[in-house]
C-alpha cells in the first residue's frame, strides 16, 4: 500500500512538472487547438486551447505503473494477466485517441478517424484484452449479488460492449473544464477501495498512479483550462474503468460508479432517438434536452433547461456530487456484502 501511494505522488509530481512544457511546445508550434460548440457561447473563448494533454498523464501513469509493478512481470505473479491487460488497454486506447486527435489537429480533418475506423480499432483492442486476461482466467459469468449469470462464449460480447461503451461514454463526458478528469478520479477512488479490500495490490497501484496523474493534470485543466485531455485521454480512461471492473469481477458496479458517464450517454441517445421519431411523426424534429451531452443542457438552463444558465463550476460540482454519492452507495453495497 505504501509503495502504491508513493507511485501516486510520483505520478502527480511528474505530471505537474511535464505539463507546462507540453503546453509551451503546443503554443510555440502554433498547433491548432480544440474546436468549440457555437451553441454554448461561453465556450468560444476556449478555441485554440491546447489539447491532447492526455498524452502526458497517460505516459506518466503507464511508466510509473510498470516501474512499481515490475515484480509482477518478473516473478510469474498471479496478477500478471490483470495487470498486463489493464496497462495494455490504457496504452492501446490512448493510441486510438491519439490518432483521432492527430488527424483533427495536425491534418485539419474535423471528424478525425471515421466512426467505423474508431469502432473497429476499439473492438480489436477489446478482443486483445479478452485474450490476454479474460480467456486465461476462465471467466464467463457475471456475479450480481447472490445471482450468477452464466454467459459462456457470449461473455466476450459483454466485454466488448463494456469496454467500447464506457470508452465512448467518458469521451462524451469530457466537454467542460475539469468534468471528466475529476469524475474519473472519483470512480477510481471507489475501485481503489474495492481493489484494496480484495487484496489486488497490483491493480491498486495502477489505480492510485492514475489518480495522481489525473490530479496533476487537473492543476492545468480546471476552469479556466490551460489544456484539454483530448480523445487520447478520455477514450483511454473510459476503457480503463471498464477493464478494472472486469478484472475485479464487479462489472455491474460501473453502472453506478460511472453513473455520470451513463447519464451523459443516455442523454445523447434519447435526444437523437426522440428527434428522429418526432421528425417522422410530426414533420419536424423535437428535443428533450436543450443540448447534449447532458452537461451542456445544464449550462444552457439548469436541470429543467429553462432556468438560469449554470457556470461550468456549478455543472462540475453537480455532476461530481452525483458521481461521489453513487460511488459511496456502491461501496456500501459491495463492502457491506449487500451485493458482490
UniProtKB/Swiss-Prot annotation:
The record's listing under InterPro entries reads:
Glycosyl_transferase_4, PNAcMuramoyl-5peptid_Trfase, PNAcMuramoyl-5peptid_Trfase_CS
The UniProt entry, under CDD domains, shows:
GT_MraY (cd06852)
Protein's pathway? Cell wall biogenesis; peptidoglycan biosynthesis
Q: Which UniProt keywords apply?
A: Cell cycle, Cell division, Cell membrane, Cell shape, Cell wall biogenesis/degradation, Magnesium, Membrane, Metal-binding, Peptidoglycan synthesis, Transferase, Transmembrane, Transmembrane helix
Pfam families xref list: Glycos_transf_4, MraY_sig1
What does the entry list under GO cellular component?
plasma membrane
Give the protein's cofactors. Answer: Mg(2+)
Q: Give the catalytic activity.
A: UDP-N-acetyl-alpha-D-muramoyl-L-alanyl-gamma-D-glutamyl-L-lysyl-D-alanyl-D-alanine + di-trans,octa-cis-undecaprenyl phosphate = Mur2Ac(oyl-L-Ala-gamma-D-Glu-L-Lys-D-Ala-D-Ala)-di-trans,octa-cis-undecaprenyl diphosphate + UMP
Q: Where are the transmembrane segments?
A: 3-23, 53-73, 79-99, 119-139, 144-164, 176-196, 200-220, 227-247, 250-270, 315-335
Q: Which GO terms describe its biological process?
A: cell division; cell wall organization; peptidoglycan biosynthetic process; regulation of cell shape
Q: How does it sit in the membrane?
A: Multi-pass membrane protein
Query: Can you name one GO molecular function term for this protein?
Result: metal ion binding
Return the EC number.
2.7.8.13
Compartment(s) where it occurs, according to its Swiss-Prot or TrEMBL record: Cell membrane
Q: What class of enzyme is it?
A: transferase
| The family this protein is said to belong to | Belongs to the glycosyltransferase 4 family. MraY subfamily.
Function per UniProt = Catalyzes the initial step of the lipid cycle reactions in the biosynthesis of the cell wall peptidoglycan: transfers peptidoglycan precursor phospho-MurNAc-pentapeptide from UDP-MurNAc-pentapeptide onto the lipid carrier undecaprenyl phosphate, yielding undecaprenyl-pyrophosphoryl-MurNAc-pentapeptide, known as lipid I.
HAMAP family given in the database record: MraY
Q: What is this protein called?
A: Phospho-N-acetylmuramoyl-pentapeptide-transferase
Taxonomy of origin reads: Bacteria, Bacillati, Bacillota, Bacilli, Lactobacillales
Amino acid at each position: 500500500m505504501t509503495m502504491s501511494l508513493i507511485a501516486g505522488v510520483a505520478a502527480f509530481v511528474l505530471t505537474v512538472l511535464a505539463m507546462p512544457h507540453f503546453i509551451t511546445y503546443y503554443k510555440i508550434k502554433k498547433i491548432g487547438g480544440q474546436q468549440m460548440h457555437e451553441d454554448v457561447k461561453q465556450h468560444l473563448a476556449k478555441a485554440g486551447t491546447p489539447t491532447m494533454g492526455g498524452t502526458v498523464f497517460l505516459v506518466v501513469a503507464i511508466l510509473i505503473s510498470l516501474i512499481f509493478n515490475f515484480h509482477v512481470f518478473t516473478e510469474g505473479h498471479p496478477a500478471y494477466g490483470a495487470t498486463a491487460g489493464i496497462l495494455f488497454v490504457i496504452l492501446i486506447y490512448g493510441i486510438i485517441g491519439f490518432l483521432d486527435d492527430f488527424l483533427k489537429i495536425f491534418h485539419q480533418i474535423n471528424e478525425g478517424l471515421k466512426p467505423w475506423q474508431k469502432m473497429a480499432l476499439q473492438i480489436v483492442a477489446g478482443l486483445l484484452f479478452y485474450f490476454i486476461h479474460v480467456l486465461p482466467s476462465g471467466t464467463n459469468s457475471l456475479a450480481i449479488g447472490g445471482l450468477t449469470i452464466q454467459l459462456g462464449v457470449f461473455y466476450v460480447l459483454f466485454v466488448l460492449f463494456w469496454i467500447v461503451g464506457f470508452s465512448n461514454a467518458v469521451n462524451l463526458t469530457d466537454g467542460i473544464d475539469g468534468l471528466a478528469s475529476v469524475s474519473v478520479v472519483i470512480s477510481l477512488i471507489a475501485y481503489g477501495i474495492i481493489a484494496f479490500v480484495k487484496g489486488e495490490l497490483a491493480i491498486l497501484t495502477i489505480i492510485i498512479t492514475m489518480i495522481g496523474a489525473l490530479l496533476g493534470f487537473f492543476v492545468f485543466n480546471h476552469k479556466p483550462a490551460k489544456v484539454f485531455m483530448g480523445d487520447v485521454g478520455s477514450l483511454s480512461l473510459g476503457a480503463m474503468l471498464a477493464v478494472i471492473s472486469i478484472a475485479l469481477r464487479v462489472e455491474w458496479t460501473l453502472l453506478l460508479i460511472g453513473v455520470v458517464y451513463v447519464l451523459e450517454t443516455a442523454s445523447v441517445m434519447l435526444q437523437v432517438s426522440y428527434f428522429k421519431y418526432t421528425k417522422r411523426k410530426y414533420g419536424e424534429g423535437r428535443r428533450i434536452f436543450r443540448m447534449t451531452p447532458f452537461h451542456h443542457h445544464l449550462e444552457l438552463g439548469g436541470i429543467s433547461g429553462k432556468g438560469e444558465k449554470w457556470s461550468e463550476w456549478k455543472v462540475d460540482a453537480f455532476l461530481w456530487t452525483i458521481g461521489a454519492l453513487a460511488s459511496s452507495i456502491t461501496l456500501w453495497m459491495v463492502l457491506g456484502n449487500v451485493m458482490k
